[in-house]
Amino acid sequence: MESLSQHTPMMQQYWKLKREHPDQLMFYRMGDFYELFYEDAKKAAKLLDITLTARGQSAGKSIPMAGIPFHSVEGYLAKLVKLGESVAICEQIGDPATTKGPVERQVVRIITPGTVSDEALLDERRDNLLAAVVGDERLFGLAILDITSGRFNVQEIQGWENLLAELERLNPAELLYPDDWPAGLPLEKRRGAHRRAPWDFDFDSAYKSLCQQFATQDLKGFGCDGLGLAIGAAGCLLAYARETQRTALPHLRGLRHERLDDTVILAGASRRNLELDVNLSGGRDNTLQSVIDRCQTAMGSRLLGRWLNRPLRDRAVLEARQDTVACLLQDYRFESLQPQLKEIGDVERILARIGLRNARPRDLARLRDALAALPQLQTALSPLEAPHLQALAGNIRTYPELAELLRRAIIDNPPAVIRDGGVLKQGYDAELDELLSLSENAGQFLMDLEAREKARTGLPNLKVGYNRIHGYYIELPRVQAEQAPADYIRRQTLKGAERFITPELKAFEDKALSAKSRALAREKALYEELLEILIAQLAPLQETATALAELDVLANLAERALNLDFNRPRFVEEPCLRIRQGRHPVVEQVLDTPFVANDLELDDNTRMLIITGPNMGGKSTYMRQTALIVLLAHIGSFVPAQSCELSLVDRIFTRIGSSDDLAGGRSTFMVEMSETANILHNASERSLVLMDEVGRGTSTFDGLSLAWAAAEHLAGLRAWTLFATHYFELTVLAESQPVVANVHLSATEHNERIVFLHHVLPGPASQSYGLAVAQLAGVPGPVISRAREHLARLEATSLPHEAPLREAGKPQPPIQSDLFASLPHPLMEELARLKPDDLSPRQALELLYSWKTRL
């Protein structure tokens, strides 16, 4: 671009700052507006639907501009962050009254999708994460930072597949990776993914920086020894957070090493298919979290979301949670705790904003109310005997001195920002009170002074006044001016009057004229002092917030167990999964009719169920409810079943539903096969596998062959498997595979209409009811009638599929004919009509040659 010397002084200042932040939209403060210039203005006008103008000139060209009022900036920032944009906030830090030329300006903070902390820019019930990754194709170091809570986690992950699955689980708002990685990588498609210089991931500088941040000699205490790649990623995150926040980060107090082998692994497809926190339409209604989340605090809801997306395999922790839920259910103890927890609010994020020194007055008011509620909450916890509850109670400390300080300092309902003052209580600081009194009571002082001076001088026409040029004055008519006392100092002569000032009035003037600005400066300084006092107590306060969030989740699980009729599952060492009267926790909430509960029994002798039955019969619901019951058990929750006994699982896989991956260029069948391949490669005998309609995306024989082979493979792995299929040929697997059993969803026909009974019964289904379901769906009658004709012909003429030999005395498994299978070859029809006894040998030979030619 042109030399800066060609620009006006103000635009020179702008370009110097903009060159330091080329990738961010710059909000450049000018009076009561944030202005955007040039390409930033054009982009913002389009994204925010604001007016683009061109005013003035610089370097001989008009300047494209767009402006935003400073008092309504939060709404615009929220929209930009949601769109994945980053913004540099440039404020006036100089005094316009004393500055020659452009007022000094400085970028005071950078707002990016992964580092926002303002309440207005965040979803209060969802984590907002910043991630960094470094490594090669074999091993990756991944670091995750939640700047709004201070959680800072690291892990090392084997292979691209596991890395991408973990990123899908975490769903970070921003992802940083080295600039020297090749183009076209899968993670480049993620929102908020952008490159950083390779040296930002350097291990040595990262290690030093992290030790400095945590005030430690090394990182051994965090269990991070040997995690070179993860430490490099963590160092990059710390540097990025410092760069964007422009302040110390005292709420980042340590690292936590996460291990995949501590958790039940859920593939991305499994998380989507089970609709844990997002439904298949992308919304949040009718998800597992929408049903089981009645947490009283936003931080509790966020913790519950993390539990659902990262179930545990630690039996001791899970049983401690179960004991806590059981304890809170006794005598309905949770009912007294939940209203108290509601008074606590989102302390976790408030403390983070205090650490970042951008806490608002209302944050401190909420913290004041939370601290005031803690003693009563602690009293309520003290008699509860569950060991885990006692451990939580030990971390929920009271802070009487801080509570009293905030009670004395902050008014009951403070304004949103400190900018205009009016936050601190009268009586908190004598100097502030005096300044405010001067500012607010100047008129009364002048009236009192006028009355006193009239009485002292005996001059009834004396007036006390003020003008902007000469300030405060005492005015006397010219005829009385000679009678002015000796301490009156002449200030101004008018046509018919003289104006004076006294030492007392001069002293008042000096105070009053600067009182408002001095009061505001004093109040801001006192507010900063309050933040520093709170920052000094940040570590114990954060421990308390963590304990409060977990208490909220456990009290919520107790409430849900009572009101949704959930019961305690029992973990056992014996490999098994036994569910009595299990229910789907989401479906039962939206049904107008009672949900039909069903049993499930898998053990070391029965590892796989082949599930048959009509469409809409409930196969998918039965499979999903099993997975959700297992998942809820692995977060320490009670489950929607009369009883449940299970061993720990290592993974939950689902191959359910079908959809194209248009962005990835994959067909429905390709997506299905990719998910199937992932399951077949990674499932173990401790995995739960749900397979629904495998093979339906291709031709009948290809699909059947693939489904059959996949089922045999899973049976060989001895994974806990629910295999729903319309290929009735698969029901014979139970005869050749001892660990396989058949069940079906019951249905019946009444007056040529299908009635779904939804009961799971032993054995294969007797028929598919496909045409009855089509009729129920509204397929026209003539089409149904024609389909019946085709079905009868296909059943009469199609060759049966080969299957393993049956044992003597066992019934023939039912054959499901596929409405969309290929029609039989014409030769098959001729062969069916042929009467061999009517043919001579010569005719038979000619016919054989004819058929051979036509094949």
From Swiss-Prot:
GO terms for biological process: mismatch repair. The keyword Kinase does not apply. Gene3D superfamilies: 1.10.1420.10, 6.10.140.430, DNA repair protein MutS, domain I, MutS, connector domain, P-loop containing nucleotide triphosphate hydrolases. ATP binds at residues 613-620. CDD domains: ABC_MutS1. The keyword Nucleotide-binding applies. SUPFAM superfamilies: DNA repair protein MutS, domain I, DNA repair protein MutS, domain II, DNA repair protein MutS, domain III, P-loop containing nucleoside triphosphate hydrolases. Keywords: ATP-binding, DNA damage, DNA repair, DNA-binding, Nucleotide-binding. GO terms for molecular function: ATP binding; ATP-dependent DNA damage sensor activity; damaged DNA binding; mismatched DNA binding. PROSITE patterns: DNA_MISMATCH_REPAIR_2. GO terms for cellular component: cytosol. This protein is involved in the repair of mismatches in DNA. It is possible that it carries out the mismatch recognition step. This protein has a weak ATPase activity. Belongs to the DNA mismatch repair MutS family. This is DNA mismatch repair protein MutS. It comes from Azotobacter vinelandii. The lineage of its organism: Bacteria, Pseudomonadati, Pseudomonadota, Gammaproteobacteria, Pseudomonadales.
